[in-house]
Amino acid sequence: MKVTKKVLDQSLCCTALLALVGGAAAQCALPSSYSWTSTGALAEPKAGWAALKDFTNVVFNGQHIVYGSVADTSGNYGSMNFGPFSDWSEMASASQNAMNQGTVAPTLFYFAPKDVWILAYQWGPTSFSYKTSSDPTDANGWSAAQPLFSGTISDSDTGVIDQTVIGDDTNMYLFFAGDNGKIYRASMPIDNFPGDFGTQSEIILSDTKENLFEAVQVYTVDGQNKYLMIVEAMGANGRYFRSFTADSLDGEWTVQAGTESQPFAGKANSGATWTNDISHGDLVRNNPDQTMTVDPCNLQLLYQGRDPNASGDYNLLPWKPGVLTLQV
């Protein structure tokens, strides 16, 4: 058959149309119930460390950049990052780099409007603090600490804990927990960021301590005009995540997968055999920027797990990284 330019043009047109239709079909809603597969433990703490935990992760230049907290063999907390790696199977051999100053329970993202990397954390000079950098791979290339939030909360043994930061087109939002059954929110105009959210916050969710414990994370759901929040809960069979959704970051949050038997992620649906706990971690994002965007067609959760037979001092429990992949 002789292929004329007209036929070729029509073929290319149809191919493009099919690709467009296929792309539209690929837009996924969040599932009504979740089922995952899990890796085993992906890395062992290096000598002198008892635990690797509280992970934050971005993909930059095709490589994972992971920061986290460490507990040493005396139960003291510090901070670290992994050397960049391309595939989760490479995490075990990636370097584990201690930070000179602690940035415990970190949140890492690229703030696009100012072309700067942000590392937000707790237990710094203020309730929450942040540092900036032009190179997120360098564990000790961060600026001096700056105030991110200076407020306090009541009815909490820990005080403010486990922040996350996310932005829309006009505002930046700070969400955090208190190990007390409450989730808190503060905001500022995006033009003022990076900066201090001040001293005021509002309670946006309230429940039992067990149901709203810590490790809150908030994400933009790609293509859905929706936001996803996950919060770590304490269950009869270990730590698990509950999920909530909202139509705007300043809006009301509605529980989505909220029970231990049907969680966002937990022993009931993780597929993990090496851990009962699915604890403090971070969904893998589409891009590293402040929108914290995740692809509902390809959800993965970097989490901390541990040997269920381990017991004793919480700060010495052998937490290690693992990854869940959503079954679709």
Curated annotation (Swiss-Prot):
EC number(s) stated in the UniProt entry for this protein: 3.2.1.55
Glycosylation sites recorded in the entry for this protein: 309
GO biological process: L-arabinose metabolic process; xylan catabolic process
Family membership noted in the UniProt record: Belongs to the glycosyl hydrolase 62 family.
Superkingdom of the source species: Eukaryota
Gene Ontology CC entries for this record: extracellular region
Localization annotation: Secreted
EC main group: hydrolase
Designated name of the protein: Probable alpha-L-arabinofuranosidase axhA
Enzymatic reactions: Hydrolysis of terminal non-reducing alpha-L-arabinofuranoside residues in alpha-L-arabinosides
Protein keywords: Carbohydrate metabolism, Glycoprotein, Glycosidase, Hydrolase, Polysaccharide degradation, Secreted, Signal, Xylan degradation
Record SUPFAM superfamilies: Arabinanase/levansucrase/invertase
Gene giving rise to this polypeptide: axhA
Signal peptide segment: 1-26
Functional summary from the UniProt entry: Alpha-L-arabinofuranosidase involved in the hydrolysis of xylan, a major structural heterogeneous polysaccharide found in plant biomass representing the second most abundant polysaccharide in the biosphere, after cellulose. Releases L-arabinose from arabinoxylan.
Gene Ontology MF terms: alpha-L-arabinofuranosidase activity
UniProt entry tagged with the keyword Signal: yes
